[in-house]
Amino acid sequence: NEPMDHAYVPTTGHFLGLASLTVDPSRVGALIESAHTILAGLDPSDEMAYALYHKKLWSVHLNDQNGLKFDEDKSFGVVDLRRAFNQVWVLERNGYGQNGEFIGLDVKALRTQSKETSTKHLRNSRAIFLRLVDLCRTLDVAKVEDLRAARDYEELDLMIVNHLLGS
């Protein structure tokens, strides 16, 4: 599996700072993988938002991760649904994909499987992603902004969790 004990440029901010010093910074962008961000102890949606703000998010690889162990490449959204929602929310709210960017699914089968079930991790990741896109599009954005303005983050969290639960 991919080594995780050497991070020369540990965050998107560090990377973009270093990239700005190159001969042609316009040729440099970020590909953010959810699991690698989680392995670094960071939040993928924060890293994506930072790169988007700087117009440097060129691609994402969505997957999930249990925590600080090896790179698991689990199906997107199966470990932390709220974290997955936050990633989709950031991408959707910023129109990601409308200018030629693409979203990849960097996932793998959990164990040796039969041929018939060997691609279910891709199907599951895609289904979860598309369902989260629908949920992002149906969340009451005005209420989200009202709660942010009121700094009522507990109510905002509950509202989003209830939306994810379908209530």
Which sequence ranges carry the predicted segments?
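Histidine-acidic metal/acid-base catalytic patches
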Residues: D5-S167
